[in-house]
Amino acid sequence: MAVGKNKRLSKGKKGLKKKAQDPFTRKDWYGIKAPAPFAIRDVGKTLVNRTTGLKNANDALKGRIVEVSLADLQKDEDHSFRKIKLRVDEVQGKNCLTNFHGLDFTSDKLRSLVRKWQTLIEANVTVMTTDHYLLRLFAIAFTKRRPNQIKKTTYAATSQIRAIRRKMTEIIQREASSCTLTQLTSKLIPEVIGREIEKATQGIYPLQNVHIRKVKLLKQPKFDLGALMTLHGESSTDEQGQKVEREFREQVLESV
């Protein structure tokens, strides 16, 4: 009878099993700094692999997108349904300097706004800011009952919807194209544009829950370190040298 190998028998130990290394020992924590328009500047921390050989940690961090609740950035729970996207543009020491990258609503908030017996009106506008950021803004609005209205439904006619959408587009275009990205962010936080639309469309049909529900960054200009440092309240270059108060003394060598 031929004798073959028994596969069920365990093989002899050729070498000891390698000890699993904790991947976190090769990583470092970096702080994330929010730009000027927001009240809270320290957003949180992010992990990245340490610089080894040709792999630079700074290159891995640049371009990283961070999503933060506006409630955390403003210390106000009324903004909890809005999410802000921040993009890491520069790394200074152990800090990641970010810039505004976009805005969005939470899905539960959007679903809670849609109800029966009313008309939903949406508009989107592509605008260029004065500092050459190309953005697309998405607006949302809902019709509401007029004062002393008995009728249950608040449906707007097609002509009214078109007129409201035209007015929404005009206001967004005017407000966004006449300011920088930082100024636009300052307008988006207190919802200035939404209130402006609500006021301007009162004569066509009363509106409620008017919001800029989403902001999408389509194109950005060439990276400017000076502008980013100004946004974070720092100076990239010290143009004026520090005055030296030290008294000059001529050194006299003693003759040997």
UniProtKB/Swiss-Prot annotation:
Q: Where is region (Disordered) located? A: 1-20
Task: Specify the domain of life of the species encoding this protein.
Answer: Eukaryota
Pfam families (UniProt xref): Ribosomal_S3Ae
Q: Where is the composition biased (Basic residues)?
A: 1-18
Example GO BP = translation
Report the residues modified as N-acetylalanine.
2
- Give the keywords, sorted: Acetylation, Cytoplasm, Ribonucleoprotein, Ribosomal protein
* Cellular component annotations (GO), alphabetically ordered: cytosolic small ribosomal subunit
Tell me how this protein assembles.
Component of the small ribosomal subunit. Mature ribosomes consist of a small (40S) and a large (60S) subunit. The 40S subunit contains about 33 different proteins and 1 molecule of RNA (18S). The 60S subunit contains about 49 different proteins and 3 molecules of RNA (25S, 5.8S and 5S).
Full protein name: Small ribosomal subunit protein eS1
Gene name? Answer: RPS1
